Curated annotation (Swiss-Prot):
Family annotation (PANTHER family): PROTEIN PREY, MITOCHONDRIAL (PTHR33505:SF4), ZGC:162634 (PTHR33505)
HAMAP family linked: UPF0434 (MF_01187)
Organism: Shewanella sp. (strain W3-18-1)
One Gene Ontology term, aspect cellular component: cytosol
Protein name: UPF0434 protein Sputw3181_2540
Family from the record: Belongs to the UPF0434 family.
Disulfide bonds: none
Domain of life of the native organism: Bacteria
């Protein structure tokens, strides 16, 4: 099942309540403010803080 990008208008980061970005390749929703990635399982975003993984920016 594919992720519906329309959900980006209504979902928010559960930590900071900020906007999330969709990473199609990794099938994750990214919160740049908190540097967290939330998995998408079978098209459903798992917006639980304990399921998020920290992301690091490579320069």
């Amino acid at each position: 099942m594919a992720f519906d990008k329309k959900l980006l208008d209504i979902v928010a980061c559960p930590v900071c309540k900020g906007k999330l970005e969709y990473d199609k390749t990794a099938q994750q929703l990214i919160c740049k403010a908190d540097k967290l990635a939330y998995p998408i399982t079978e098209g459903i975003p798992v917006l639980l803080e304990n399921r998020a993984t920290p992301i690091t920016e490579t320069v």
